[in-house]
Design a protein with these regions (language model features):
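Short, small/polar-rich loop/turn modules that mediate ligand/substrate recognition or access, typified
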Residues: 175, 180, 234-236
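Conserved glycine-rich cofactor-binding loop
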Residues: 8, 15-16
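Active-site helix of classical SDR
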Residues: 123, 159, 167
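Substrate-binding pocket helix/loop in short-chain dehydrogenase/reductase
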Residues: 99-100, 107-112, 194, 205
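C-terminal substrate-recognition "lid" of short-chain dehydrogenase/reductases
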Residues: 127, 135, 213-241, 246
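Alpha-helical segment proximal to the catalytic Tyr-Lys
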Residues: 128, 172-173
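Residue(s) in the substrate-gating loop at a strand-loop-helix junction
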Residues: 143
Length: 247
């Protein structure tokens, strides 16, 4: 039996990259996993099929979690299937990188809506069930950019910094119900997003990282599993998984 046997988890943005790795890692420890996606149905189904092939239980759920009604509907579908929700991983996010001089109002609001508002919508959707259960683990995927800032990413930095502040307040309010709320702040991680960066720029970024390499999605997933399975007395914290790029 795994550390998370019979636990029910929702992972947003779970069809690829870090979200995919998190979904697979939670399932490997026995959790039943709702694999959320917005547009990548085939990729989400592949994650579900992989989990089932390994003896686990999972289902795909399409929801644009930047919309309150869709986030709540997603949670309701999980409750209808598995009667509970124990773990929420708020991972879904986007970028629209431009310097402040070129950033549009739409660039700003779209990133805030997708990255920050989605965390609020999903968290408040699972809260009543976790409070009733007297158990819950909420893990929000932030970024070192929310701590250090990054050129051309004012909107992204604000959204990820907001996640950290939200995490601390939610942790204060939910601790008495045995619901922990923590944030993970990854550094530069090998994902589709990083793959789009020109190789020359990647080398410049890698040179900034004390450990001399990019992170792996699986390394982020290991930290999520730790918080979900063993982090009973950890709440309101931001945990950096970044190779030392920000200390």
């Amino acid at each position: 039996m795994g550390k998370l046997t019979d636990r029910v988890a929702i992972v947003t943005g779970a069809s690829r990259g870090i979200g995919r790795a998190i979904a697979l890692a939670l399932a490997a420890e026995g959790a039943k996993v709702a694999v959320n996606y917005n547009s990548s149905a085939a990729a989400a189904q592949e994650v579900v099929d992989t989990i089932i092939a390994q003896g686990g239980e999972a289902m795909p759920i399409r929801a644009n979690v930047s919309q309150a009604d869709e986030a709540r509907s997603m949670v309701q579908q999980v409750i209808e299937r598995w009667r509970r929700v124990d773990i929420l991983v708020n991972n879904a996010g986007i970028t629209r990188d431009r310097t402040l001089r070129k950033l549009t109002d739409e660039d700003w609001s779209t990133v805030i809506q997708n990255n920050l508002n989605s965390v609020y919508y999903c968290t408040t959707a699972v809260m009543p069930y976790m409070i009733e259960q007297k158990y819950g683990r909420i893990i929000n995927i932030s970024s070192f950019v929310g701590q250090a800032g990054n050129f051309g990413q004012a909107n992204y930095a604000a959204s990820k910094g907001g996640i950290i502040a939200f995490t601390k307040t939610a942790a204060l309010e939910l601790a008495k119900y045995n619901v922990t709320v923590n944030a993970l702040a990854p550094g530069f991680t090998i994902t589709d997003m990083l793959a789009k960066v020109p190789e020359q720029i990647q080398e410049q970024i890698r040179a900034r990282i004390p450990m001399g390499r990019f992170g792996l999605p699986e390394e982020i997933a290991k930290a999520v599993v730790f918080l979900a399975a063993d982090g009973d007395y950890i709440t309101g914290q931001q945990i950096n998984v970044n190779g030392g790029v920000y200390m």
